[in-house]
Amino acid sequence: MILSPGTFLRVGVLLLLAVILQLSFLSQLGILGGHIDLVVLAVAACAYYGGSEAGCATGFAAGFLLDLASGATMGVTSLVLTAVGYGVGRFREVRDPSHGLLPLAVGAAATGGFVVAFAAVSFMLDVGASVSPLVIRDAIVTTLLNALFALPVFTGSRKLLRPALKVDPLELRRRRRPPRETGPLGLRGLEV
C-alpha cells in the first residue's frame, strides 16, 4: 500500500465501519448458531490487497478498536487479528492474488484461523472460554458464513482501497499479454 494520509483515512473508515456494523448489528444476528464476523473479513481484505505489513497494522488497529468498543479483555482480539493479517498478507506476497474467487478461500481460512486462535488465547488466559462440542459447530458455521460474505466484502474493500494500492490484482489479470501470433515453430528466424 502507498502510505499517505488518504490511505490512513480509507483504512480507518473501512475498519470503523466494520467494527460498528459488527457490534451493532451482525453480532446479534445468529444464523444456525453462527454469526458473520465482518471485522475479520475487513482485516483479511486489507492484508490481501496491501501485504503483510499493512495486514499487521490493520489487524492490530481493528482488534484494539473492537476490544475498546466491546469492553472485552484488552489485547486478545488485537493479538489474534495481527496474526491473521500477517498470515493473509504473507500469503498474498508469496502467491498470485489475481484469481477472482480466491477471496472465498482466503476469507474462510482467515476466519477459521481467527476462531481457533481466539479460542486458544481465551482458553490460555481463562477469559471464560467454554469447552463444548457446540463451540466446534458454531466455529464451522461462522467460517462458512464468512466464506459466503467474503466476495462482497473483498470487492467493496478493493474499490475503497484501489487508489492506495501499489498493484491492483484485477489489473494484472486484465493486462495479460495475448498469445503471440507467429509462424510454425520450425521456421522462426528464417523469415519465410
Regions found by a protein language model. Name each.
Residues M1-V192:
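Terminal, non-globular segments
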